[in-house]
Structures are given as C-alpha cells and as structure tokens.
Amino acid sequence: MAWPKLPAPWLLLCTWLPAGCLSLLVTVQHTERYVTLFASIILKCDYTTSAQLQDVVVTWRFKSFCKDPIFDYYSASYQAALSLGQDPSNDCNDNQREVRIVAQRRGQNEPVLGVDYRQRKITIQNRADLVINEVMWWDHGVYYCTIEAPGDTSGDPDKEVKLIVLHWLTVIFIILGALLLLLLIGVCWCQCCPQYCCCYIRCPCCPAHCCCPEEALARHRYMKQAQALGPQMMGKPLYWGADRSSQVSSYPMHPLLQRDLSLPSSLPQMPMTQTTNQPPIANGVLEYLEKELRNLNLAQPLPPDLKGRFGHPCSMLSSLGSEVVERRIIHLPPLIRDLSSSRRTSDSLHQQWLTPIPSRPWDLREGRSHHHYPDFHQELQDRGPKSWALERRELDPSWSGRHRSSRLNGSPIHWSDRDSLSDVPSSSEARWRPSHPPFRSRCQERPRRPSPRESTQRHGRRRRHRSYSPPLPSGLSSWSSEEDKERQPQSWRAHRRGSHSPHWPEEKPPSYRSLDITPGKNSRKKGSVERRSEKDSSHSGRSVVI
C-alpha cells in the first residue's frame, strides 16, 4: 500500500515540532533594576521546559561589574565601548571580577543560600523569582538566572539582570540628613532664645518658644539700635528721656528736673549735635522712635514713692546722699575790731543774752539782716547808758517807780557801763530772756507759746535790732538805784506785785544780773547760754543763731 505524499510545508512542521518541544527557554521581566541601600527588591525570572518540575534546578549567581555604570559612565573607555556596541559593565572574563552563588533550589524544596549569604534575608519564590530584603552595599552587580532541566540540551539556559545599588545616593542622603539634624538642633537652640530667633519651625525640644513673634523681635531689635545710636545723636544725656522707669536713667536722681513737668516752658531745651559720617538708620527704627515719642506723656504725675522722696528741693550736699539730712545753720556774731577786748567780751555776752529765739524756720534773708545795722551798734556805744536812762524817764513816767521797786525787792545789783547797753528802749510787749540764776532753776520748763498779737507785732519789728531789753515787771529793773528803790511807796510796790504780767507763771519773774564777773564765771555763763541754745533748738527743731 503506498503512502500519499505530503506537501513540503507539512513535512517541515512535523520535523520541527518535536525539536521545539524538547528545548529550554528562560525569560526575565527587567534586565536592569535600580535600588537604594537597605531596600527590598524582587528579581523576576521564568522558564519553560519539557522536563519534570521536581527535577529542575534554579540557580542565582552574582557577578560584579567590570566597570561601574555609575562612577565610570563618563569615562573615555566606557564611552568608547558604548560607541562600539559593547557593554563595558559586563563584557569581561569571570577571572577579572567576583563571582558568587546567591541561592539554589531543586524542584519545590527550600532554597539553599550561598556561603556569603547565609545570614541574609534572601529567598526564591514562585518558579524562579529572587527576593532580596535589605539590599547591601556589595549587592551592586549582575545577577544570572540559570535553569538546569534534565533531557533539555538545547535552548538558552540563563538570563542576566543588572542590579544597580545607589549606594552613593544613600551616602549623600546620610550626609544631608546629618546636616539637617545639625540644622534642626540649631533651629531649636535659636527658638529657645526669642531675641535671636531665626525661623518659624516648631521644634520638639522647646515647643513653648517656637514660632517667634515678629513684633517682639522687631521691638527688641529697634531698642538695641536706639540705645546704640542714642549717645551719638544727643549732645547731653537724656535726663527727661522717654524711659522714666529705667534704672539707668538719671531722671529720678535729680529732683529739680521733676518740677512743673506739666508746663511746656519747664522742659529743658536740649541742643542737637550734628553728627557726621553716621551709618544710615533703617526706616523701621525711625518709625518706632517716632511712635514712642508720640506716646510719651510728659504731664504724667510722678509715682508716690518719688513724690515722697523728692517732695522738697534739697541742697547740693544732701542730694548726693540717699536720705535728706536736716542740718542746723549756726552763725557766729560779727567781730568789732575797733573796740577793746573787754568791751568786745561784754558786748558779745549781751548779744548772746539778748538774741531772741526765732519763731519760724531760719531764712538766709533773716541771717543777712544782722549785717545791716553797724550804725545802730555805734550809736549804742556813743550814747552810753546814761542817755538811755534819761530818755527812758522822759518817755515813761512810771519807770522811776519800777526802778525803785526793783531795788527794794531784789538784792543790790551792780551793772557796768558797758553792760547797760543792753537796756535799749523797746516795746513793752516783746519777750525777754531771764538771767542765769533763774534760768538754772527753770531750765526744764518749756518756753511759753506767744500770743497772736505778740507774733504779729514781733513780725512787724523783725528788722529792728535784736539788742533790746523787755519790760521788767514787778520791780526788777537794771536801771534802778538804791535811792529810787527807797523813794518808791509801799502801796505802789504792792500794786505792782498784784498787777504783774499775766504771761509769767510766777509772781516774781527772773531778773538780769551783772555780767562784770570773773573770767571763770564768765566761761560758765557762756556754757549755760550755749546749752540753753542747744536745748531750745532741740525743742523747736529749727536753726539757732549763736
């Protein structure tokens, strides 16, 4: 029986079909992959074979690059190989590069890792996919997927996949991260100091001071610039400056500057000095200074503590200290050089006895009034005691009676010619000072307070000389003699005793005694006078003229 002849195409198909079914074919999805350090990656690989799957062996090999595709890409040799159609990263012998077995698996068994990958997280999944967890620095190279199937001798048993690890990029990222960390630390440090704040990033180290207020920073900056430019712009220190509450300001230390702040004319006119070659001032500084000056209220009253401290003007010496010290002003009597020593002694004693206690605080004008009466002193010395006695008898008819009664009631008193100068005529309503013996017995008594009438008349006679003697009631008289006292009738003496001055608490007021005494007694009398002046000054709290 003869077989029919088949056409030629069918004959070729029948002969090629068994050969194609018995061959091995390996395929990969990507021939080149990029990955960073410590990342995970899956290298896809698949195959077709006629052999049994349990007999197929999958092997992944690693070969390093001949030339690095990253660092050597712009080299001349690399570019020349690319121009010739070659692959300079993989076109070299295996003895010129490093070759390692990564993993191997037979059938569906567990993969076996290579010697250099025993501690790595690497596995083979699906048919032939390689999974690498945490890519390392030395994983940068070419990976070959090789399939071994028994009985398949033809075909392409392996495929390559380039794994490019961007380790240089990771290094750059690490460096940048370190710089960012330092910058973050610096930012947090700046945020903790608001006056030097440089950004507005919220930091975990100091969350309470983050997001610096722009107005506070600008105010602080303007104040520092104003303090730096203040001494250059003003010729004199700003005693009445805007910052009254500042401790550096000298405003509270000068009480004269606090006088009449509400009056525009009381403000000191401070000259402005023209400065040359000064750096330009920012507009913000000028605007801030103008705003502060507009808000300045010069008529604002002083705080109560400053009013209490500087309520009255003080002298130059007292203004240097922290407390106002009350001082007594003591004026010595003027010296008369044309008199003899005995006359100067007696006159100074009379001036000490006859100087009244001032009834108001001491004034410089009152102190100057002592020097306006040199003619009055000379007139007293020229006229003598006799002329004063004659005038006293002519003006006062009852003077002779009082003269006699004083001699009857008191012991004999001897007056010198110079001591009788104290008996100048004056009004009978002025106060007078007692002599030493009654004063010693009554030194503890407070002086009586003058009546309003006496104060008014004494104020009217303030410019009169102080060396006058008051009226001597109840028969005490420095002009009396023994004969006048004998001629005085008893009824007159009794009448004078009954009608003594109501200002004296006792019946017999103190009397003047003679000042013609020994030097020892004179010194004791001076001491008593000085003690009396000190005691009166301590009682009154006012100045005393000695």
Swiss-Prot record:
Entry-linked InterPro entries: Ig-like_dom_sf (IPR036179), Ig-like_domain-LISCH7 (IPR051874), Ig-like_fold (IPR013783), Ig_sub (IPR003599), LISCH7 (IPR008664)
Key words of the record: Cell junction, Cell membrane, Cytoplasm, Deafness, Disease variant, Disulfide bond, Immunoglobulin domain, Membrane, Non-syndromic deafness, Phosphoprotein, Receptor, Signal, Tight junction, Transmembrane, Transmembrane helix
Domain of life: Eukaryota
Modified residues (Phosphoserine): S499, S501
Topological region Cytoplasmic: 189-546
SMART domains according to UniProt: IG (SM00409)
One matching Pfam family: LSR
Coiled-coil region list: none
Gene3D superfamilies to which the protein is assigned, alphabetical: Immunoglobulins
Stretches the record annotates as Disordered: 399-546
Segments in the Extracellular topological domain: 24-167
Annotated ranges, domain Ig-like V-type: 24-162
Protein location: Cell membrane; Cell junction, Tight junction; Cytoplasm
Basic and acidic residues: compositionally biased ranges: 442-457, 527-539
Keyword Ion transport: no
Subunit structure: Homooligomer. Interacts with MARVELD2 and OCLN; the interaction is required to recruit MARVELD2 to tricellular contacts. Interacts (via C-terminus) with TRA2A, TRA2B and SRSF1. Interacts with PLSCR1.
Annotated family: Belongs to the immunoglobulin superfamily. LISCH7 family.
Function: Maintains epithelial barrier function by recruiting MARVELD2/tricellulin to tricellular tight junctions (tTJs). Crucial for normal hearing by maintaining the structural and functional integrity of tTJs, which are critical for the survival of auditory neurosensory HCs. Mediates fatty acids and lipoproteins-stimulated CCK/cholecystokinin secretion in the small intestine. In the inner ear, may regulate alternative pre-mRNA splicing via binding to TRA2A, TRA2B and SRSF1.
Protein name in the entry: Immunoglobulin-like domain-containing receptor 1
Organism for this UniProt entry: Homo sapiens (Human)
